[in-house]
Structure formats: C-alpha cells, structure tokens
Amino acid sequence: MNEKLVKSVFRRLRRRAQRPLERVPRLTNRDFDLLQSPRALLLDLRSPFAFSSAFIPGSVNLPGFESPALLSAVGLIAARSIYLVTDSPHAIERAAKFFDRFDDMQIGGWFPGKAVEDWRAARGAAGTIEHITPDTLAIRLAAWKTVVADLRDAAAFRRAHIPDAVRIPLNNLTGALAGLPVETSLSLVCEIGTLCSFAGSLLWNAGYRQLAIVKGGFAAYVEHGLPLAES
C-alpha cells in the first residue's frame, strides 16, 4: 500500500480517537502572530451581529460553523492552517469534524470571543460592518448614497429585486464588482440576511470597507412595501 496513503489514514484515525475539544488548543493574544502566515485562515464563528460589531481583520464570518459548504463555494478549501474565534464548544466540534476529512487543512486552535478586544488593544482598530433597516436603505438609495449588492440566486433576482441592485454570486464576489471603486458604499442583501455577514467579511478583506447589511434581507425589504423591479 502507498506509504503516503497509510500515513494519511493513520493520522485521521488518531485524530478521531480524540474528542475535538481535547485536540483543538485554546489560544491567547500571545498567539496572534500565527495569523500572519499566508496559510492562515481565521474563521469567526460568532453570530453575524457580534461579528459585524468588531472583528479581527482578515477573518471570515461563518456563524456557528453551520454552513461549511460556503467555504467550498468561494474557493477557501485549500492547504491552510485554520484558526477559530468562538465561545461555543459545539461550533468547535462541528469545525473539527468537518476538517478531519482534509489532510492539508488542520485546526491550529481557537480564540475566545474576547480575543477581538485583545486584538484591538494590541494591534489597533478592528473591522466593523454596519447593520441597517430596509427604511434606511430606501433613504440612502433615494439619495444615491449606496449600491445594493444582491446575493440571491439568479432566478430569485429575475423575479424581483431592489431597483438598480447588482447581483453578485458568492463564487464571484469581487469579479461581479469589477470596476467598482473599493470606496463605494455597498448595501448587502440576501434572502433573509443570513449570508450577508459571510459575504461581507470576504468583501471587507478584498478592500471594500463601506459595507452595510440590510437587517432581515430581501424578505424584510418586501414586507416594508418598498419599491421593486423585475428583470
């Protein structure tokens, strides 16, 4: 049998013999330098609102690690060292079980939620993403102060969308915005608001810093009786 394959199987069996919380070490602010590696991927598993209020620059929001398929959708499944920000043992366990299937993606440890404040104290400003109501969005649109980035699928977008919205598929976020200056104010909309913090974290990392998430997503916008367009 191929020696490399044997070693791979052995590593997986050894990892599975341990409970996730036993083999994923807790990290502190003394471990922030680990995040400087080009292989590092920091997944912030806190809620969208907690993440948007303050996050470590470069992190990706994946609340509760409940939708790991999103990582594949945006090309983040690759040879990486994974670090987590969370206070949830269940989220750590879900992440550990998911990454067990990959030989070249290892969880290096987890930071508690307070690590964001530790980062701010030690390294400077944390990232933030605004949350706005549908009514606030309507006011900004009327004043031409924002561009709506719609994350829904093509069929839903064709049926109805916010006037002048730009559809940006998750697997081509920055490509869909090509030519749009990073200083542009973007208001993110998905079906009910659950995808926006994930997409927002990726856009923030790509240089777009004037970001807002529409609370309740497109469903809330419709409930407010605001204008719609069709393709």
Predicted region positions:
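Long, low-complexity segments enriched in small/aliphatic residues
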Residues: T28-D33
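Metal-dependent catalytic core segments for phosphate chemistry
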Residues: L45
